[in-house]
Design a protein with these regions (language model features):
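A C-terminal functional module that forms or caps the active site or interfaces directly
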Residues: 279-359
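Short, positively charged, Gly/Tyr-enriched micro-motifs
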Residues: 29-97, 189-192, 199, 355
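Active-site- or DNA-interface-adjacent structural scaffold in DNA-acting proteins
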Residues: 72-132
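A short, flexible helix-boundary coil/loop motif
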Residues: 3, 17, 21, 60-62, ...
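An anionic, glycine-rich sequence signature occurring as long contiguous blocks
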Residues: 211-315
Length: 404
């Protein structure tokens, strides 16, 4: 099958971006080009390969196709070579070429719309080993991910030792990010003074959960939103209120959002940089059997009074779980990967997250599940791979026409 240059222009662009990666291997001993390695791993992951052995098998099986746009000097590497070379790549550089590629194919139709960056940790359970007679204990790979609602992709990540290390990792990650016109969200574990200060220092906003780990502050906010206060807000005499309702065959779920700018009553307000509002979300579940369950979550924020922006930030926070972490487990079988080289696994996960974004773009046209799209590619690699990159090129072309 002859490939037209225009059909794989986005694929060649991806290769060109990969050629920008620094190669830390010893010169004179390099057999395989680093960009060949990266592009093959990307295409293999798109084609339903999750493990290093599967990636090497893909390269051998599809060698004739790959040679149409890659050099493949030195032949086809082994699974161990793929793992080793990927482990040597600078993770930030790798992530940057992927974010730049996605930005090229996505049209931001409202530059004034605030992006929501959700920070959350994920554990890859297959990457650990218990201590044995001849085996040292190896801990799980823990990663702090930053998910962009606007780009619908993970735009940054940091390897951490334990889940609790998210707290200290967040300021370091924030230093790398442009937070202009951005709202940062995270769960209550990470609601710390240093973290909100880091957001404000980079020009961003925050809307973050508050729980008992903040002691008196949590109790004070909880006491403020008593039943009388909620009635005042609902009646429009203070703050803002919004109600939404969802129905399914088992229950009716009601969400009530309360936000107020009255925060000067709190004596330590200056300790929380940029604090301008506090809020509450009350979720009520009315089940079909007549039982009712109610829960309340409390929030602090640098946002001015705007219940639509406030409620949207809270809802969109869960995208990091639903659209990223769940897909990494369900579609890419992350917990099944037993790679012990943490850097190799970390970089492979960066590649998988990039592939997830590509597949989500393709899904808009294919109208199939991500798993089915990957299966389709694996059954007819050349045809389906070309089709995917043609679609990405078409998205790119439509962006150019819209921007004129």
């Amino acid at each position: 099958m002859k490939i037209k240059e225009i059909e794989i222009s986005k694929l060649k662009e991806l290769k060109e971006k990969s050629m920008m990666l620094k190669d830390e291997r010893q010169k004179g001993k390099v057999i395989y080009k680093i960009w060949d390695i990266v592009v093959v791993v990307i295409l293999a992951v798109l084609a339903d390969c999750n493990e290093w052995e599967e990636i090497a098998d893909y390269a051998r099986d599809e060698k004739d196709f790959l040679k149409k746009f890659l050099k493949l000097t030195g032949g086809i590497p082994t699974a161990k070579t793929y793992e080793r070379v990927i482990s040597l790549i600078d993770s930030q550089e790798l992530n940057k070429i992927f974010v730049d590629f996605i930005k090229d194919i996505q049209f931001m139709d409202d530059i004034y719309f605030k992006d929501i960056l959700s920070f959350d940790g994920k554990v890859d359970k297959g990457s650990s080993r218990k201590k044995g007679y001849i085996v040292e204990e190896t801990k799980h790979l823990n990663v702090l991910n930053v998910y962009s609602d606007k780009l619908q992709m993970c735009i940054d990540q940091e390897m951490i030792e334990e889940k609790t290390n998210e707290i200290t990792a967040i300021p370091d990650v924030i230093k790398r990010l442009d937070l202009t016109n951005v709202i940062c969200t995270w769960d209550a574990l990470n609601t710390q003074k240093d973290n909100v200060k880091a957001v404000i220092s980079k020009g961003g906003d925050y809307c973050v959960a508050l729980k008992a780990n903040q002691g008196n502050f949590y109790k004070d906010v909880q006491d403020y939103f008593d039943e009388d206060r909620l009635l005042i807000i609902e009646s429009g005499y203070e703050g803002a209120y919004q109600l939404t309702r969802e129905k399914n065959h088992e229950a009716v779920i009601t969400y009530e959002y309360y936000q107020t700018e009255k925060v000067n009553w709190y004596p330590d307000i200056k300790l929380w940089e940029g604090l301008k509002s506090i809020g509450l979300v009350k979720r009520t579940i009315d089940q079909s059997d007549g039982t009712r369950v109610e829960e309340k979550r409390y929030y602090i924020s640098s946002l001015l009074l705007d219940i639509s922006v406030f409620s949207n930030a809270i809802r969109k926070h869960w995208n990091v779980e639903n659209k990223l972490h769940w897909q990494m487990d369900f579609t890419f079988k992350s917990d099944d990967n037993t790679t012990m080289n943490k850097k190799a696994l970390f970089n492979l996960q960066i590649i998988k997250k990039f592939c997830l974004t590509i597949l989500n773009e393709v899904k808009k046209e294919k109208n199939k599940s991500l798993k089915r799209i990957r299966k389709d590619i694996s059954r007819n690699v050349e045809k389906e791979t070309i089709e995917i990159f043609k679609l990405l090129r078409n998205f790119d072309t439509s962006i150019i026409s819209k921007s004129r």
